[in-house]
Amino acid sequence: MEDIKNSAGLTEEEFLKQYKPSDYERPSVTVDMLILCMNKCLENLKVLLIQRKDHPYINQWALAGGFVGIKESTYEAAVRELKEETGLENIYLEQLYTMSQPDRDPRMRVIDVAYIALIQEQGVKAGDDAKDALWFDITTFNDEKLILQNKEKNITIEYNLTKKTCTKLDLFSWARLSPGRNIPTKSPRINSNLVISYF
């Protein structure tokens, strides 16, 4: 079979030999997991959040997640991060959405692949870069407000929601708190303004 050449007269092998990946900026890739469960009485939906141990957003509550290793798929990274940060294993994750807004992470350009799972309630244990891992009851979720509560540690997170004019709710925006706010574990009430993105 004849080697096909491009307009510069190069075969694919020649092209790849001189190709320089450094000519293009490369974003980092992360994963986040939206893990939901019903409580044992099947009367209330809960969401799993971790408390960040380090910057950025130190001490703030967020979805479990982290960076994808160079030799792993996003699914493999999601499984690994979920186990490292919460102790949960053997959870079937479904890919939900890819977030690629250029300024979504203060460190660098990051593309995030989000996964979702609905599981039976089970114990969680913080590890790796998670300071704590807790189930929060979703006590209110409507067009105006989202309220999450963990009664055991007396934590309430309240978001005032604002719609943008579009069509689809970004389920992950509400799990990230606004930058620069420290949240003490024993805080009885946390007020935070948040914009829910629609697209």
Question: Where is each model-derived feature located?
Answer:
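Entry/capping segment at the start of metal-dependent catalytic domains
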Residues: 4-14
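Unchanged
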Residues: 68-92, 96-199
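N-terminal strand-loop-strand
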Residues: 12-62, 75, 90
